[in-house]
Amino acid sequence: MFTGSIVAIVTPMDEKGNVCRASLKKLIDYHVASGTSAIVSVGTTGESATLNHDEHADVVMMTLDLADGRIPVIAGTGANATAEAISLTQRFNDSGIVGCLTVTPYYNRPSQEGLYQHFKAIAEHTDLPQILYNVPSRTGCDLLPETVGRLAKVKNIIGIKEATGNLTRVNQIKELVSDDFVLLSGDDASALDFMQLGGHGVISVTANVAARDMAQMCKLAAEGHFAEARVINQRLMPLHNKLFVEPNPIPVKWACKELGLVATDTLRLPMTPITDSGRETVRAALKHAGLL
């Protein structure tokens, strides 16, 4: 469940900005039918930053309900205050989720020791498997391989989503962790190379709109068929890149609407609708991928 193509699913909303259950069900059904390995609910792409804690928990529980055991659900539970992250994580202790994705604290930029103590404290307050999430371009701090190696020895910490796009990190981390520590890419454009170096899969934005292709690419890579996987990846490469032509999840939410997967591409401020130029750029990438 912690391998292959794991979608960082969008949180669909109606025109008033309320979570749209019907669109979420349609998305989940799409991922079940497409072979997606698991769903990350309310991560960065799921607009965690603009949902309050009650809404956050409600979306995760709604996702679990709609998934109905057909696909594993991972909850995004990160926060920049350790006590807050613990509280959010503990909401899901007996919920049925299979694990938590916990981002490094953002804005306050803790030291490596602070990061170690933060994640250790969270892991000690739950029995849920914890996946570390390193995305310094968003958080302002970088979880270094040496710290990952220390954290890998903590009970319940089972893997990392590495979203730096720095492929040297794969071997650096592999040298410091056990073979069963899960290495997941958080960068679609380099995910195949990440897997070829020994990674286990990707937590993907692209999978929101190209679920079957991403699942097949990861399956081929896991089986060692990298030439065949690369054919798929090259077709998707413009999409990997252009889904970030404007801040995530603006482009991917619009793409989901364009493909009829959600009813609207409504976002909450400070996220604003995609621009005309952004729309045309993403549409061209969808066509290149064979999705339009």
From Swiss-Prot:
Cross-referenced SUPFAM superfamilies: Aldolase
Subcellular location per the Swiss-Prot or TrEMBL entry: Cytoplasm
Catalytic activity from the UniProt record: L-aspartate 4-semialdehyde + pyruvate = (2S,4S)-4-hydroxy-2,3,4,5-tetrahydrodipicolinate + H2O + H(+)
GO BP terms, alphabetized: diaminopimelate biosynthetic process; lysine biosynthetic process via diaminopimelate
GO CC terms, sorted: cytosol
Stored Gene3D superfamilies: Aldolase class I
Keywords carried by this UniProt record: Allosteric enzyme, Amino-acid biosynthesis, Cytoplasm, Diaminopimelate biosynthesis, Lyase, Lysine biosynthesis, Schiff base
InterPro entries linked: Aldolase_TIM, DapA, DapA-like, Schiff_base-form_aldolases_AS, Schiff_base-form_aldolases_CS
Subunit structure, as described in the record: Homotetramer; dimer of dimers.
Protein name from the UniProt record: 4-hydroxy-tetrahydrodipicolinate synthase
Primary gene name: dapA
